[in-house]
Swiss-Prot record:
It is an enzyme of class 7 (translocase). This is Na(+)-translocating NADH-quinone reductase subunit C. It comes from Vibrio parahaemolyticus serotype O3:K6 (strain RIMD 2210633). Keywords: Cell inner membrane, Cell membrane, Flavoprotein, FMN, Ion transport, Membrane, NAD, Phosphoprotein, Sodium, Sodium transport, Translocase, Transmembrane, Transmembrane helix, Transport, Ubiquinone. GO terms for cellular component: plasma membrane.
């Protein structure tokens, strides 16, 4: 009987030992995978910023191009002024605007009238990306997001130093219907935005997503997305909000007045 008990104890010990070893291996692998996923997310974001900035690779890798030409800066949405750190103490290099928007202490809840993009909350501090060549700023990139039919759609918009002319746009995260709303990522549709004016002569948001197609030569209009009216409405709401007083409107006004110099 004692021999049987010893055998059972040894078996249990082996099982428990193996379980502990396996759990340690799995935990270590999970941590490593999570770190790799974060690194890949950062690289993908930098890649989209470099792309919309129109920077040529010339054999260089994305992190090198980003470090050389892109300068992230924080902006106080209330004033449109640059700030050195966000309310939570973050600097531009490590600021997470999405995370800040979820925290009551670092964001505001939007009213139904204000919330044209259907984002519910907006961080108090935003981030922009200056495209630089030495000390000279050639463009500014603003991140925008708004709700489509099925998903929150995130984009980067490159704007010339007049604070008004679009030089590029890229949607880098969205879950709209492939072939319909998902066409926000189509290069042909994105190409329409180049040269469009964000504001009218009175400095009011003027971008229009036109169902059926924008008139030829329109300064402010881009074609709607065929079969994806609600996604198009989401794009419209996104620009109505982020170009307005609650978004980057005050900041772009300062850019227009030479605030980047």
């Amino acid at each position: 009987m004692a021999s049987n008990n010893d055998s059972i104890k040894k078996t249990l010990g082996v099982v428990i030992g193996l379980s502990l070893v396996c759990s340690i291996i799995v935990s270590t692998a999970a941590v490593g995978l999570r770190d790799k996923q974060k690194a890949n997310a950062v690289l993908d974001k930098q890649s989209k910023i470099v792309e919309v900035a129109g920077i040529e690779a010339n054999g260089k890798k994305v992190p090198e191009l980003y470090a050389e030409y892109i300068e992230p800066r924080l902006v106080d949405f209330a004033t449109g002024e640059f700030v050195e750190e966000a309310a939570d103490g973050s600097k531009a290099a490590n600021y997470d605007q999405r995370k800040a928007a979820k925290d009551n202490a670092t964001s505001i809840k939007l009213t139904a009238e204000q919330d044209k993009a259907k984002i519910i909350r907006r961080a108090n501090t935003g981030i922009v990306y200056l495209v630089k060549n030495g000390d000279d700023v050639s463009k500014v990139i603003i991140p925008v997001h708004g709700n489509g039919l099925w998903s929150m759609m995130y984009a980067f918009v490159a704007v010339e130093t007049d604070g008004n002319t679009v030089s590029g746009i890229t949607y880098y995260e969205q879950g709209e219907t492939p072939g319909l709303g998902g066409e926000v990522e189509n290069p042909s549709w994105r190409a329409q935005w180049v040269g469009k004016k964000l504001f009218d002569e009175n400095h009011k948001p003027a971008i229009k997503v036109v169902k059926g197609g924008a008139p030829a030569g329109s300064e402010h209009g881009v074609d709607g997305l065929s079969g994806a009216t609600l996604t198009g409405n989401g794009v419209q709401g996104t620009f109505d909000f982020w170009l307005g007083d609650m978004g980057f409107g005050p900041f772009l006004a300062k850019v227009r007045d030479g605030g980047l110099n």
